Amino acid sequence: PMYQSSANLDLYAFQYKYDGRNRCIWKKLPGAGYVEMVYDNADRLVFSQDGNQRALSTGNWMYYKYDGLNRLTEQGTCTNKVTTSGTNVLVQHFYDSYAFRSQAGFNNSNFLDDASGNGKGALTASVATVLGSSNKIYTAYYYDIKGRVAKTVQSNLLGGYDVTATIYTFTDKPATVTHTHTTSGKPTRTEMYTYSYNHADRLLKVEHTLGGTKITLADYAYDNLGRLQSKSLHGSATNKLTYAYNVRSWLTGISGSKFTQNLYYNNGNGTAKYNGSISSMTWKAGCLLYTSPSPR
């Protein structure tokens, strides 16, 4: 709409250019500098440069490296788009095995060997450089026999580690997620989320345990059609939200002690809509009632 009153492509248009192989080699978003992209013979992005990088005296470029299976293995900055001279590695990725444990940052007891072979074909580790410093974040991923992430171990900037372990249900949904946080010179903290499901695999309850104390974060109830009927927060009836639907299962209302909302489609104050679009809505917080007809 703004372009119609002020025909300025740089401010109001999304612009793209392509090469002979139909690859996007240049793009410009409204109000931003243009981005250049360079590809290799396998059509993989190998260099890119945005307006901020172009403004630097060194003319930085982002570079990308891949393995034989076209998986990203390294990315960072360099000073030209012909060779990776002046390289500053920002992110590295490792796949298939845990041979990375011999490298600095991974060669300690917090990162375990895994001889199960479950990591074959999957991302097993990554190293990320903290911008503006020489610090790095080391992360390892461990998988179960079904290829699901069972454990993640990550170093943190406080001299410790964050370990996340997930146990799954038979249908591949998380049953428990345990997060252990360690910091140099301070006690270890452990928290656990527990998820309960009904016979149809719909989420029924989320519980949180910290310091041995378990609380209920949310309870969910469903109607006979599987639609969310109510949600109670922190096990309290006063923090309960109920949901209403029409015969087409379009959401028509949310009601609770602190917030109420009604949605209108082919009725209400707005122009009637019969395609599922909302024509108007009303919502109430406390004693104040607001009305908002749809702009369309």
Regions found by a protein language model. Give the residues of each.
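Extracellular/periplasmic, surface-exposed regions of secreted and cell-surface proteins
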Residues: 208, 220, 224-233, 238-260, ...
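Beta-turn initiation residues at beta-strand->coil junctions
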Residues: 1-6, 20, 26-32, 47-53, ...
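Short, ordered secondary-structure scaffold segments
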Residues: 88-155, 258-289
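Hydrophobic or amphipathic alpha-helical targeting/insertion segments
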Residues: 60-80
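Short, acidic, Ser/Thr-enriched surface-loop or helix-capping motifs
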Residues: 19, 40, 67, 144, ...
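Conserved small/polar residues in nucleotide/adenosyl-binding loops
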Residues: 290-295
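Short, small/polar residue-rich loop motifs at catalytic or cofactor-binding pockets
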Residues: 10-12, 31-33, 58-60, 135-137, ...
